[in-house]
Amino acid sequence: MAVAEAKPQYSHAEKKRFRKSFGKQTDIMPIPNLLEIQLKSYRDFLQTDTKLSEQLNTGLHAAFSSVFPIESFSGNARLEYVGYKLGEPAFDVRECKLRGLTYSAPLRVKIRLVVLDKDASDDPKPIKDIREQDVFMGEIPLMTDVGTFVVNGTERVVVSQLHRSPGVIFEHDKGKTHSSGKLLYSARIIPYRGSWLDFEFDPKDCVYVRIDRRRKLPVTILLRALGYEAEDILSEFFETTRCHLKNGEYHIDLIPQRLRGEIASFDIHVPETGELIVEQGRRITARHIKQMEKSQMQDLVVPRDYLIGKTLAKNIIDTSTGEFLAQANDEITEELLDAMANHGILQIDMIYTNDLDHGSYISDTLKIDPTGSQLEALVEIYRMMRPGEPPTKEAAEALFKNLFFVEERYDLSAVGRMKFNRRVGIKSDEGPGTLTKEDILSVIKTLIDIRNGIGMVDDIDHLGNRRVRSVGEMTENQFRVGLVRVERAVKERLSLVESENLMPQDLINAKPVSAAIKEFFGSSQLSQFMDQVNPLSGVTHKRRVSALGPGGLTRERAGFEVRDVHTTHYGRVCPIETPEGPNIGLINSLSVYARTNEYGFIETPCRKVVNGRVTDEVEYLSAIEEVDQYIAQSNVELDAQGNILADLVPCRHQNEFSLTTPDKINYMDVSPKQIVSVAASLIPFLEHDDANRALMGSNMQRQAVPTLRSEKPLVGTGMERIVASDSGVSVVAKRGGVIDLVDASRIVVRVNDDETTAGETGVDIYNLTKYFRSNQDTCINQRPIVSTGDRIQRGDVLADGPCTDMGELALGQNLLVAFMPWNGYNFEDSILISERIVHDDRFTTIHIEELTCIARDTKLGTEEITADIPNVGESALSNLDESGVVYIGAEVKAGDILVGKVTPKGETQLTPEEKLLRAIFGEKASDVKDSSLRVPSGMNGTVIDVQVFTRDGLEKDARAKSIEEEHLARVRKDLIDERRIREEDIYHRVSHLLLDKVATGGPGSLKPGSKITQDYLDKVEREKWFDIRIEDDAVSQQLEQLSKQLELLTKEMEKRFNDSRKKIIQGDDLAPGVLKIVKVYLAVKRRIQPGDKMAGRHGNKGVISIVVPVEDMPHMEDGTAVDIVLNPLGVPSRMNIGQVLETHLGLAAKGLGRKIAQMLDERQTPEAIKAYLEKIYNHDGVQRVNLKCLNDDELMTLADNLRAGVPMATPVFDGATEQEIKSMLQLADLPADGKTVLIDGRTGNKFDNPVTVGYMYMLKLNHLVDDKMHARSTGSYSLVTQQPLGGKAQFGGQRFGEMEVWALEAYGAAYTLQEMLTVKSDDVGGRTKIYKNIVDGDHRMDPGMPESFNVLLKEIRALGIDIELEHD
């Protein structure tokens, strides 16, 4: 019973091998699916599972809604969008990869055409006709279950983009623009779609505006264009001071605060008492202002000079005559004051400015503004946007309106509006998508406030100002681009609707939409060839966020600040994982727990803390919401109730790290690994490594090649199982049940009754991927890890993929490592390895190469794939079948023919002798040439698969037919198994119904009235059970139903087989002019050898320098030779001490495994073994692994699996302490310092000092010497210089450059130098001669003129200099 209870606690694979964890913190929440960012984004884009009425305004639905309805120019007809539905994909993912197709589904959109009665005089016009139709709008690529797209047969990933969020941003130039170092402030309104609007100060403190980064204009031109007059502009931006003329004296309304800091230009008295408050020439201070307020002064008498030079806030008009005496923003002069007195104007409004916090910026800008009216301003903007075009009033108005105020041309988006409103202090987060007058005013006001010292500029690199644009959103944008193109074409055709009785299908051409989508997935900078070296590289690629790409940054322009780690990256973006090189900091990886919210900002989870007590409630916070919170780290000490124990807690607040009291804490981190990405979270003892080395370690794990036999790391972090299951490379059970059948290529599961719903089959068949080529030519192969009869749960791992071992990620091998020098062979990070590693195939990898042969239709005739090839010996054709295609299983080497192909030659005039020979020996030989597919140089391997694709309508050859037969046999096998299980299920239910029932008759010896027994049923054939007649009518009806189910089952299976058959035997849709394509897959086995690159997980990389025989390797006293020797000098300066700790813990893990193996060999009781395992797993009294839930068989299986070592998990930032490592070493009876005396294998002498020996997890990286090294004798030459090409891909030579020439000159090696620069390089005549001479056995050299010298002569002549060679 205990076992049944424990089923949900541990998965099938976990129970076979537990990982001992040292983590002190229990993870409060499970790690979310690692691919969720991709899957959710595209799910929201398609909304396939949502009803039409419930669809949100996102994705496809939003794109259609924004473009439709489309009205004709006359307004008499319009197209409306009703809804859409996606069809079923024609081929599944596997077939698309094989056939080179795109995995996509047809999109059909319901469009309604509404025609109005144009002759009617009513408004709105009555509807004359409505036509509805489903219109095909092209194919939409579908995302696979693992977050990738299959485009033209290759797997691609669309990387998320981190771009500037729409909204408004305020910044300054950091004093770089002007020589004085003055800060010039600017504001920029960034829309999601449309023109950018910039406001900026110049060194003279005038405010300018730019539209789309064009020529700048004074900002008041924009304000005038919006309909504001000078008076309105000044009243919006300035406070006013009013002055009255009373009895020949000027009185200003006194607001004492405004005088603070000014120097009094006259004595200030209290009017009633005459008391002097400030004397002339003194600065007015806060004390003076208090006195003024105390004496309740309402106004202040000022001398006339005080007004001179002040600026008017309003126009001054003589009300009796209507005459303008002065305009708003004019300066007050002596003449103006006289004129006002003469006209009886007793009141003046002036703008209030000071040098400190009320600058006269807008007033100064108005002074340089050349326009005087709205029309002039519009014309000025028109001239700036369209230089050279003659402006008209209508054109200028339309242009300005279209810039920011029309939804089709301008969209801030929901994010932009939210960011905009929050920044300029508008309460609501919602509003129109276009700009309003008030928006523009509020931005200018905020900018001026910042210039006046109120408020701060924004930090562009803050993650609250950068948002993630994922796949769905980018696809939607492309889709909208396509729809807008369609809209233009449709508008023109809509005018024909009334006359020609057209349907929606006739109006809409879906090509532009398909083209836009195809272009995005095929050639966008963010749609990338998936990194598929191993499961981790795939997961990381999908979780990547890039600042590059359309609408993003470029490498050249990105500065240091953008690339740097920012405080808001905490828990959102990994501070470690980023590429080395020009993209450093521009391409990042999401942290383990991070996700994006509805606005696209990255959020990280936090536990809520209430009154110093931590709760289990988890909230996701974005960088904007986090600023004002106090957030503690996850390793804070808590008591049993969750109260924080410390008096002062380190926390994050306002993007800074500080100490605070527990009562202030609002939130706490969820987990210590929350700040790092998936790759970094796989590095044990990450906390002991330098950041630069951790970066290399993260990146190099992604380059690890899957080995022949995957081996789990002895020292891991506990993330291995999560990465392996989420990556999609292993097979995970969709539903629980019992394993019915297992072989190397498929698993059949009989599903639990409670997990099958009506109409679903009770069988799950998993076809495994066998020896499939990845994008990087590594091998994808799945192996079952379950046995027939095993009971499994939903989510259990059924089969391991590449780089997985028992459902855990396994990128490399555990090797016995010694840190010591060894005869200089590990100088400069070189590595020396034991021959045993090569012999045991520890690092043998399989690489699969795809070679393609295409038969085309040429002008001279068709190419043919055949075994009948001219001038080729019998031995060369020994691997080909009668169709001319290589057999599967053939061992081939460089130069061997894989596919025989002949190409027609052009007709040549034949001599009589040739004609005679042709008449005797037949036609074929001479009019075709051999163009067979051969194995490229430097490659050898085994043919593991051949695919033949034939153009539709052409006769298939024998090989193509046999491949089809194999395919059909596989389909048939699956269907037979499924049918068998479902039939058994039906018959089981029938027997259950019939047993012990009273029969009224039936086949065989069944008498009416007798009871049905099991013996009777066993004797009668199953098919005849339905002929038994039962007294009970209800049972008879159930029997009838089951009989119908059986019939339906037969029909369903036949239909499914016929559908599959049709798909398999149909011809292929090949490119124009292509008749047949043959793809040959070669498996190349690569053993590890000197020159290959290896690395640990801590950035400790090196190249193998030598493979040493086992007997020469250093060995321990018990005779165990070490596998690998590393240089100890590689540790201290690199500061990656994690590798040493890993080595110690690895030794302990192996030692514990050895002890368990010893106990098993001594046949000790399960209780004794369980007691020892309890010591290992639950060493500190905390029950981490519940061994009580295992029965004896399961316990012994577990112990058996631990012989090779007890796997350990030391989570990042929460790992094993030094003391814990020592206690594990002692438990395994090993020295606590982890050092061992080693003996030199060659001499038998002990080394002077004990050496650090232990187990380290080493990876073989995808930088193999076989792929890099090549040799050339003769080959292709560059056209212009006639020098050999460079690089392996071009079969090129080595460059003998300038410095190499100097070296030979220094040695005086004249003949060698001459040979290098002539016959070995670009002396065309000389190299032909020497080749001939060598063939004849004559090794003399006759050098001529190098071709590059002739090129030099030509270049000099091109400069107009006459130069010739003079021959003596």
Swiss-Prot record:
Record annotation: effect of changing S537P: In strain: K69 / isolate 8844 and K91 /isolate 8756; rifampicin resistant
One Gene Ontology CC term in the entry: DNA-directed RNA polymerase complex
One GO biological process term: response to antibiotic
Organism domain of life: Bacteria
GO molecular function, one term: DNA binding
Keywords: Antibiotic resistance, DNA-directed RNA polymerase, Nucleotidyltransferase, Transcription, Transferase
Pfam families named in the record: RNA_pol_Rpb2_1 (PF04563), RNA_pol_Rpb2_2 (PF04561), RNA_pol_Rpb2_3 (PF04565), RNA_pol_Rpb2_45 (PF10385), RNA_pol_Rpb2_6 (PF00562), RNA_pol_Rpb2_7 (PF04560)
Entry keyword annotation includes tRNA-binding: no
HAMAP family per record: RNApol_bact_RpoB
Family to which this protein belongs: Belongs to the RNA polymerase beta chain family.
Subunit structure: The RNAP catalytic core consists of 2 alpha, 1 beta, 1 beta' and 1 omega subunit. When a sigma factor is associated with the core the holoenzyme is formed, which can initiate transcription.
Protein name as annotated: DNA-directed RNA polymerase subunit beta
Gene (name only): rpoB
